[in-house]
Design a protein with these regions (language model features):
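Class I SAM-dependent methyltransferase Rossmann-like catalytic core
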Residues: 2-54
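Conserved class I S-adenosyl-L-methionine
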Residues: 54-64
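Conserved SAM-binding loop of SAM-dependent methyltransferases across substrates and taxa
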Residues: 65-77
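Short glycine-dipeptide loop
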Residues: 78-79, 156-161
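S-adenosyl-L-methionine
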Residues: 84-131
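Glycine/threonine-rich flexible loop motifs
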Residues: 130-141
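A short glycine-rich, Lys/Arg-flanked "PGG" loop and its adjoining helix->strand segment in the class I
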Residues: 142-158
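Class I S-adenosyl-L-methionine
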Residues: 168-217
Length: 217
């Protein structure tokens, strides 16, 4: 018998379980050995925008459980991906892992020291603890995206790319302005693997400008 709340509606956990069981990307992730269905989101983003070229140095922020890291190493190659998360994560073959909280003051320096030379791609699938209040959740994820962008502005090599998750809403004007100032091309994209009912979308910024061009010199 279906589990229901006092109001006769299915519990959130039951709805989540049914959604997982009926989700083709969940089944595909298990079949293909990916740690999460989110792997297909990055694969679809890269199929469209080609940011993960072989040999490019990549930082994957908020990497756990590792689905995006798996796709990144498949496409950029072994030895070119640094996975970063505030929580521990099972290692992904061919990558390095750094436990680091991006909210800490020394985070950018710590990540910069861990890099091997240039940085060509910054990925962020970071998401806040969802409250269910759309405006609050939107503000929180914009803050995470801004933190990821701040790291990119400090460490990204000219010509590099930035991919980050945002929630649809009206508070990301300053973020988009910064992206358009720092990158020659900025696009929004909702990959097919992103659930239709989800407010998430992704910003894909490409061809990072060098410092002089950013300042308008």
């Amino acid at each position: 018998m279906p589990v229901k709340t006092a109001r006769g509606r299915k519990s959130a956990s039951t709805r989540w379980l049914q959604r997982q069981l009926n989700d083709p990307y969940v089944a595909a992730a298990k079949a293909d050995g990916y740690r999460s269905r989110a792997a297909f989101k990055l694969a679809q983003i890269d199929d469209k925008f080609h940011v993960l070229e072989p040999g490019r140095q990549v930082v994957d922020l908020g990497a756990a459980p590792g689905g995006w890291t798996q796709v990144a190493v498949e496409r950029a190659g072994a030895g070119h991906v640094l996975a970063v998360d505030s929580q521990t994560m099972e290692p992904v073959a061919g990558t390095r892992f750094l436990r680091c909280d991006l909210g800490e003051e020394e985070a950018v320096g710590t990540i910069g020291e861990a890099l091997d030379g240039q940085l060509h791609v910054v990925l962020s699938d970071m998401s806040p603890a969802v409250t269910g209040h759309a405006a609050t959740d939107h503000l929180r994820i914009v803050a995470l995206c801004e933190a990821a962008l701040a790291l990119a502005e400090d460490l990204l090599s000219p010509g590099g790319a930035f991919v980050a998750k945002v929630f649809q809403g009206g508070a990301q004007g300053d973020l988009l302005a910064a992206l358009k100032c720092g990158f020659r091309t900025v696009r929004h994209f909702k990959p097919p693997a992103s659930r239709k009912e989800s407010a998430e979308t992704y910003v894909v910024a490409m061809d990072y400008r060098d410092g002089e061009k950013k300042r308008g010199a």
